[in-house]
Each structure stands twice: as C-alpha cells, then as structure tokens.
Amino acid sequence: MEKLKIEYKFDLEDFIVMENIEHSYFLNDNITTAEEVMKWYEKNDLTCIGVRNADNQIIASVNILPLKKEVFKDIYENRMNEADVVYNQIEEYKDDNSYHIYLSSISIDKKYKNNYKVITTLLSGCMNLLDMLIKRNIKIEKIMADASTIH
C-alpha cells in the first residue's frame, strides 16, 4: 500500500499542481488560478489541505476557506462563483472567533480517483484541521460545500 502524507504547507508549484488536477475535472471558469490561491494561503495558511504520495507529489487537495459573511452568502445564493473569490475576502483565523467556512475545489488526481485510502486521508486532514481550530476556540458558525462533478 502506498504511503500517503497529509500536508498543510505549500508553495506556488504545489498550487499549480492542484490547479492542473482541477483542470482535469472542471471548466476554466470554475477554477481559481494558482497565483490567487497562493494569495489566499499567504493571508491564512490554514486554507488548504493536501495529500502527498510516496514521491512527495500532491495528488489530492481541498480548500477550506473562512469567508467573509457576505461572500459566503453570495456563493450560497448563487450570486457569486467560487472561482471569483479573492484573497481580501478570506478571513484570517483569530482565537475565540467564529467563521463561515466554504469547502472548495475538492480534487483528486484521476489516477487516484476511486482510491479509498486517498479519500480517507484527505478527510482525515480535514478533521485534523478542525481539531486545530477547536484547540484555538475557533467556532464554525456555518459550513458549506458544493459539488461540481459526478464521480
């Protein structure tokens, strides 16, 4: 069984790999550029979870975005596309505060698409992130995810 690693630290090359994985599933209009996602991450380094394979390559990822309440509502009410989110609409986590969270761009490299271990590793990464937030007394007021593909 291939060794997988949950990852929370990324550079622009990692985000380019994630963007390319997304291009294998989504239309260009539904994809945020790697450069913009890097800005999200620079503002709040707990906005992305990845899975690396034994070769240290990113093979799966999800963005977990603490959005400003108005932006969250606009996406929920279909007035805004998630690909249009820019870094100044992302919140920085502060201890003892609450946030509106959007799970965005859940993507798995097609070679690993139906790999149970990859999927469960990515979900474990999400749970670990939520545990990190709990330890800082950060509350999630609302959470939302949207599916764009059929698997």
Where are these regions (language model features)?
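Conserved GNAT acetyl-CoA-binding A-motif
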Residues: S98-S104, D131-S148
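Amphipathic alpha-helical scaffolding segments
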Residues: K39, I64-L67, S124
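Short amphipathic alpha-helix that is part of the acyltransferase structural core
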Residues: M1-E36, K43-I59, P66
